[in-house]
């Protein structure tokens, strides 16, 4: 998983609330078992509308999605995180996230940042006025910066550390590979091992 410390990029304003995981990536795209190749399914129902924000060339390089409240609600769908990452998003800003989506995002290298609705609206206004506006998400300082405006966000220390180290569940386990190997070596040879 790619490390996340400080990311500066442009942002796409998704002025919608109650975006569930089926809207993020419809079930028809869930037949793959790899973590890549899902960008084509991201918001596919909405991308049929030429006025949809991700169809606007001004936001084609956006790496931060700025969404309304209740983003990522609904069923547990890791594919929603994979589709957002495949599109190129590193962070999603929203006043509230679905709990399961938030957990999947943190494990999948996508930073979910909760900010007050007033902050989200200010960021929307700024990036709509100038789509090239740089937005900085600073995980080290736990801040979002746009121009002279700065907003702080909360994130538990363990999740922050994992993202900054670039550790998914497998990477975290592999940090203990020597201890696991020593444990397996101490067991009777007729017992199964993971090697």
From Swiss-Prot:
Keywords: Amino-acid biosynthesis, Branched-chain amino acid biosynthesis, Leucine biosynthesis, Lyase. Pfam families: Aconitase_C. Coiled coil: none annotated. InterPro entries: 3-IsopropMal_deHydase_ssu, Aconitase/3IPM_dehydase_swvl, AconitaseA/IPMdHydase_ssu_swvl, IPMI_Swivel, LeuD. One of its GO terms (biological process) is L-leucine biosynthetic process. Pathway: Amino-acid biosynthesis; L-leucine biosynthesis; L-leucine from 3-methyl-2-oxobutanoate: step 2/4. One of its GO terms (molecular function) is 3-isopropylmalate dehydratase activity. Its EC number is 4.2.1.33. The keyword Amino-acid biosynthesis applies. Gene3D superfamilies: Aconitase, domain 4. GO terms for cellular component: 3-isopropylmalate dehydratase complex. The keyword Lyase applies. CDD domains: IPMI_Swivel (cd01577). It catalyses: (2R,3S)-3-isopropylmalate = (2S)-2-isopropylmalate. Catalyzes the isomerization between 2-isopropylmalate and 3-isopropylmalate, via the formation of 2-isopropylmaleate. PANTHER family: 3-ISOPROPYLMALATE DEHYDRATASE SMALL SUBUNIT (PTHR43345:SF5), 3-ISOPROPYLMALATE DEHYDRATASE SMALL SUBUNIT 2-RELATED-RELATED (PTHR43345). Belongs to the LeuD family. LeuD type 1 subfamily. Heterodimer of LeuC and LeuD. This is 3-isopropylmalate dehydratase small subunit. It comes from Salinispora arenicola (strain CNS-205). The gene is leuD.
């Amino acid at each position: 998983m790619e490390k996340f410390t400080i990311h500066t990029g442009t942002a796409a304003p998704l002025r919608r609330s109650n975006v569930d995981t089926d809207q993020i990536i419809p079930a028809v795209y869930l037949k793959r078992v790899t973590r890549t190749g899902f960008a084509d399914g991201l918001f596919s129902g909405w991308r049929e509308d030429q006025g949809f924000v991700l169809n606007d060339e001004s936001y084609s390089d956006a790496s931060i999605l700025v969404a309304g409240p209740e983003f990522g609600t609904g069923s547990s769908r890791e594919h929603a995180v994979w589709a957002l990452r495949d599109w190129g998003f590193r962070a999603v800003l929203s006043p509230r996230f679905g709990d399961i989506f938030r957990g999947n995002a943190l494990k999948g290298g996508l930073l979910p940042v909760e900010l007050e609705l007033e902050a989200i609206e200010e960021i929307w206004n700024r990036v709509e006025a100038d789509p090239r506006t740089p937005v900085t998400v600073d995980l080290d300082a736990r801040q979002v910066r746009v121009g002279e405006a700065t907003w702080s966000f909360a994130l538990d220390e363990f999740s922050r550390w994992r993202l900054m180290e670039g550790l998914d569940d497998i990477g975290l386990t592999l940090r203990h590979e020597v201890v696991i190997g020593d444990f397996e070596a101490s067991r009777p040879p007729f017992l199964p091992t993971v090697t």
